Each structure stands twice: as C-alpha cells, then as structure tokens.
C-alpha cells in the first residue's frame, strides 16, 4: 500500500512567539532538516517541530542527550536504575507523546535504534550541534517506525578542545574530553556509578540451597564508555564513527543486602557512516550499525553454574535523495535500502529461582534477516505568501524469511 499525505499550511507573518512559561520550549527559529527531509526555516514548517542546540541542552544540567531531553515537553524517558539501567535490555528509552515503539531516533539522519531501543544516554552533549524533534506522525517520509515522531541528533563537524572531570558520592565519576584537529575531531568519555544497595520492597523468594530466602533488587557498579571520531574530507564528504559501551551489574539481594544472584550486562554498539552532500541538492549516506550484548548471571553459592545469553544485531544500508528548488516549489525524491540481521544464543536455568538448578541445553536462534527497500518523495508548492501545499508519499517493501510485506 502507498502511504501519502497532503498538508495545507498557513503561516503567520509575525516573527515572534511569546509564552509565559518555559520559553526554551518554544524555540521556533532556525533551520530544520528533519521534518520535510530538506532544509527549511522552522517557522515555515507545517509540523510540531522544535530545535534544541547543544548549549540549550547543557543548560538542563545533564551531560548526555537522553537526560537533557527528558526535561522537554512531550518527550518521555524511561529507565530503571540510577545510571540509566533498564532490566534485560540495558538501555534507556525515549518516546514522543507516549507512543511506545513509535519514535524513530536518527544520528545525522541515519537510523540509530535497535528494535526501538537506543543509547542516547551515551551521547555526550559536547558532541551535539543540535537536536531536531518532530512530534506526531512522521511515517510518510520515514516509515511506520516514526508513528510518534522523529528525534534527529546532528553532531558537530568540528569540536573545540575541552576537558571535564567530576566526582560525587555513591561512586559517581565523570571524565570527558573533546579534541579538535582541523578536519578531524575526537571525543572520549567515561561515566561511573557505584552500587546502590536494595532499591525495592520485597519481591518474592529465591530458593538458596533448599531454603526460601526473600529477595530485593539492587544495582552494582556500572560504567559507560564512549568514543566518537569525525573526519571532514571537504565540504561534501564526511566520515563519522561512534562506539558506545555500557557495563553494569544488577543483583538479587537478601534483606541485609548480601548478594544472592548476580547479573552482568556488557552492551557494545558501533555506528559508522559516510555522508555526501553537495550544492546541487544531492544527499547520500552509507552506514553500518552493530550491537552486541552479553548478560551472564549466577547464584553466589554456586558461581561456576552460569546462565548466559548473547545477541548480535546488525544494520547496514544506504539512503540517497535529490532536492530540486525553484522560486515557487521544492521537490524531493529518495530511495533507501536497509538490511538487518539478528541472532541469539543462550543457556538458561531449568528451574527458575533455584540456586541448585541445572542448566538447559544451549539454544540457538537465527541468524534472522530482514531487507527493507523504500521509495519516498514530496512536493512543496507555495500558493501565497502565507500558504503552502505539501504532498508526500512513501512506499516500503519489507522482505524476510517470514514473508514479504508492503507498507
């Protein structure tokens, strides 16, 4: 089926908008590239769109994108632990307007989520030029993943030299540096948090050597490492690479905070991209993303009997588009292709909640593969000084072992 939309936008000619509360929530000036797929003044964009600069996000007191955006209207941020831990996935999540699984997260216009899970808590604000948020359905240009909206993080082409060291209680440590080297720039960071002790009420019992013991959940030591490298060859070509690593522990404790069962999470992500953009309206990106997770756990009374799980999720693809402009109209047409693969290996305890349980046989799932091919376009026509009409359409072909599907 063909997804399309027609928008008739009327723009008010006054150039200033005032609000009594939280003026930074109504930043309407500036150039937006996310809402329509090409550069357009925010005031002339017929969408619920807001742009935050990296400096505005720093004013929240946060050090990363996720924790800065959670203070902004219409952005929902979920996590479980004090260091943005989340049970099982190890990731914090952002959604717009409360639509679960319907927020598409982009970094420099390239998808940066794995099954609607992202690591924006790893992205240091020192690297961010601006964040563009489009609330509401962005599915016409971006597909069904953008039902709730789109978050596009634009990183800096060049960084200033900077160094940050901070420390606090509970084992909190923060180290970050950015280095500008002409055409190249580098950002490094590590963030640490100590153990918390019990953070929940009694949740049930675990059978430890045959005895039922009440248990509580607490978080152990955690670390986040981040590396980003950019190289701008010239005004048209740019290469960027980003590495995130999150390593933390979660514990089932007894009432005295002695560890009964110990869970470890090692989550690593790689993002690589080559981007091309020229003055003739051509824009193309080739990208590769990978996420690997390992999460073993064991009972302290039987540490050699280890339950484990490993997963590997990869994405690679290209997106290219061409924009034509005239005095009266702007047209865009683009194509994209993406391939995703996923596999999971694990070996679980045969009996849940029992330290004496034996392990099941190892299980293997995948490699599963999915191919997504898209054609999209839009036409923006000025009808008068205050009115434009915009027609947009997108066709998706999704191919997998489970069958093909058109959207």
Report each predicted region and the residues it spans.
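Cleavable N-terminal targeting peptides that direct proteins into the secretory/outer-membrane pathway or into
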Residues: 1-23
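Extracytoplasmic beta-strand/coil segments of soluble accessory domains associated
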Residues: 66-110
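N-terminal periplasmic "start-of-domain" segments of outer-membrane beta-barrel proteins
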Residues: 29-60, 93
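Face-selective signature of the C-terminal outer-membrane beta-barrel domain
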Residues: 186, 232-246, 266-407
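Short acidic/polar hinge/loop motifs at secondary-structure boundaries
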Residues: 93-94, 110-135
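N-terminal periplasmic accessory domains that precede
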Residues: 65-68, 92-95, 106, 118, ...
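Transmembrane beta-strand segments of Gram-negative outer membrane beta-barrel proteins
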Residues: 29-30, 155-168, 183-188, 281-282, ...
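Periplasmic-side early beta-strands and strand-to-turn transitions of outer-membrane beta-barrels
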Residues: 160, 178-265
